[in-house]
């Protein structure tokens, strides 16, 4: 912003600032963790937190006095039912989350302070949105030090998570909190992220500031609006018309509704001008229309990675009905009492879904996320690489999950030995690596190692000898125990046709390697797969010569 004002001080600026907080992983700075932990905000647990939040919402006028707190779900544990070990861990999870939120708020404050330092605060419209969906329950029932365990259907027991307790929130973890915290964070509503049928999965607080233009400073507005209303609000506020074409491409109409009318105190209780809105995700769906909401009851729980066949996406869902003008928390389901109203809104949902290309509906989860898509690697069983290669996404890498495979590397070792990565996929939170290591002190000629990292829960190693100068063929051959997700197997490491190590794994990664890692040949561009033994620092370039690396994939 400062540079823009220095280069072209007469021009207005637009800033879209979107920090990662508080999407998992929760990674605040240690200073913020210390500050929030010292405040003991979460020590009384999620049920008490929910009551406190709801009381504050009523005190501040965010929720009307007649609003009712929705019931706690039976699928999530009550705080008082937990043991001391569980409570201690869950408090730590929430403290790190709270620190991440406070850290982000502080940085947002710095941005606003910079606007004020430029002398432009009174001339700047600020729209602050407190999130992009409901709080996430994807940490499963116990939370996790590594969210990729969730994506692979692994629920890490509380006692095992204590290994990461001192490091929670640091680069040693990829953490998320327990699902019950998510439900509490969505107070007073039901449900969480992934469930757009209910306000717990969609409702966000919004604050707007524009001195001299918004007269009712500190005023509360309860009109229904949607994120698609942000652009129309900006266009009306600035007097700019939406472009009909961009780079020669005709633009679709803006479907949202400006919120500018709500700035007038006379319109504080006026009916919303955004009268109808559909919601849909993973088969969960709802329709808002003039103060009424019809919504499906979720068929699955977002804190469970279900492999079961989902119900029929049309006929397999129960519907609920709410008058949210009178019942803003969606407490009182009127579906049984008002079937005609429900039917009217159901028909409206399908009309809107047709209009806005929502159909066909799809309520699959794991299969939808992990569906093979058109790619250069689909259907291939052999891959050959020569020389250094980096940053290849998993979708374009050899797919070694849930099958037998062979990795063969032809390398040349110089005089004095070599070290470095030959080939790797994944990293600290799950993956594998074939590399040469001179150990912690960098001595020797370089020992050949294959390391498999099972989601940072267990590492299995195959260790061979130091390689003499000259040409060598290194082979790692893995035979899977059978079909199915995450099955184990036996791996054999060979050098120049001679077996040098054999080991077994009871389990392998079933669904996905970490999405923020990559497949690399000749170096490791992201985090390392090792932790203590054979630890290395990226990029860990191979100091010998790679002639060829070949993958052969089985069934």
Question: What are these regions, as identified by a protein language model?
Answer:
Residues 503-543:
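Flexible glycan-contacting loops in extracellular carbohydrate-active proteins
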Residues 184-203, 279-335, 341, 439-440, ...:
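C-terminal, low-complexity/hydrophilic appendages and adjacent surface loops
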Residues 468-489, 552-554:
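Localized edge beta-strand/strand-to-loop motifs within extracellular or lumenal beta-rich domains
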Residues 69-72, 81-90, 230, 294, ...:
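Long, internal low-complexity/basic segments
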Residues 454-473:
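Short, aromatic/His-centered strand-loop micro-motif at the edge of beta-sheets
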Residues 1-73, 100, 104, 109, ...:
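Active-site regions of oxyanion-processing enzymes, predominantly non-cytosolic
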Residues 421-449:
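Glycan-recognition/cleft segments
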Residues 113, 148, 152-269, 317-320, ...:
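Substrate-binding rim/cap in mid-to-C-terminal beta-strand-loop elements of soluble/periplasmic
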């Amino acid at each position: 912003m400062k540079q823009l004002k220095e280069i072209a001080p007469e021009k207005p600026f637009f800033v879209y600032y979107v920090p990662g907080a508080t999407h998992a992983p929760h990674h605040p700075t240690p200073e913020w963790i210390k500050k929030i932990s010292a405040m003991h905000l979460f020590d009384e647990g999620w049920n008490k937190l929910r009551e406190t939040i709801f009381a504050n919402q009523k005190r501040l006028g965010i929720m009307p006095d007649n609003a009712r707190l929705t019931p706690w779900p039976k699928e999530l544990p009550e705080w008082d039912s937990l043991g001391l070990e569980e409570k201690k861990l869950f408090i730590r999870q929430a403290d790190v989350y709270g620190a991440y939120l406070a850290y982000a708020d502080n940085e947002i404050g710095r941005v606003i302070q910079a606007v004020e330092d430029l002398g432009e605060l009174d001339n700047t419209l600020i729209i602050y949105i407190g999130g992009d969906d409901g709080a996430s329950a994807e940490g499963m029932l116990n939370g996790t030090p590594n969210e990729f365990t969730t994506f692979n259907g692994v629920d890490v027991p509380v006692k095992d998570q204590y290994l990461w307790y001192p490091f929670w929130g640091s680069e040693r973890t990829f953490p998320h909190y327990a699902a019950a915290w998510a439900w509490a964070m969505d107070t007073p509503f039901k449900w969480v992220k992934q469930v757009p049928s209910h306000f717990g999965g969609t409702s966000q607080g919004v604050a707007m500031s524009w001195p001299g233009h918004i007269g009712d400073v500190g005023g509360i507005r309860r009109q229904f609006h949607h994120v698609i209303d942000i652009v129309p609000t900006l266009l009306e506020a600035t007097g700019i018309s939406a472009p009909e074409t961009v780079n020669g491409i005709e633009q679709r109409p803006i479907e949202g509704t400006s919120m500018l009318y709500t700035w007038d105190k006379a319109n504080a209780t006026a009916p919303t001008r955004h009268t109808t809105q559909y919601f849909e995700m993973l088969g969960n769906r709802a329709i808002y229309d003039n103060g009424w909401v019809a919504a499906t009851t979720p068929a699955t729980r977002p804190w469970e990675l279900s492999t079961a066949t989902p119900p029929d996406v049309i006929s397999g869902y129960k519907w609920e009905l709410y008058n949210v003008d009178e019942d803003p928390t969606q407490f009182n389901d009127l579906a049984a009492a008002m079937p005609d109203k429900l039917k009217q809104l159901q028909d409206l949902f399908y009309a809107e879904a047709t209009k806005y290309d929502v159909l066909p509906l799809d309520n699959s989860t794991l299969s939808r996320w992990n569906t093979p898509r058109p790619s250069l690697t689909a259907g291939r069983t052999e891959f050959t690489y020569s020389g250094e290669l980096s940053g290849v996404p998993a979708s374009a890498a050899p797919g070694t999950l849930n099958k037998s495979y062979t990795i063969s590397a032809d390398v040349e070792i110089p005089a004095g030995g070599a070290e470095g990565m030959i080939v790797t996929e994944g990293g600290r939170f799950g993956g594998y690596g074939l590399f040469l290591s001179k150990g912690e002190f960098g001595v020797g000629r370089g020992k050949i190692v294959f390391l498999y990292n099972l989601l940072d829960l267990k590492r299995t190693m195959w260790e061979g000898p130091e390689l003499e100068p000259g040409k060598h063929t290194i082979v790692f051959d893995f035979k899977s125990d059978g079909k199915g997700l995450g099955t184990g197997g036996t791996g054999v490491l060979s050098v120049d046709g001679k077996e040098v190590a054999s080991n077994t794994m009871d389990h392998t990664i079933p669904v996905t390697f970490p999405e923020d890692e990559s497949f690399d040949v000749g170096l490791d561009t992201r985090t390392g797969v090792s932790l203590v033994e054979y630890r290395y620092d990226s990029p860990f370039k191979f100091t010998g010569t790679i002639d060829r690396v070949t993958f052969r994939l089985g069934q």
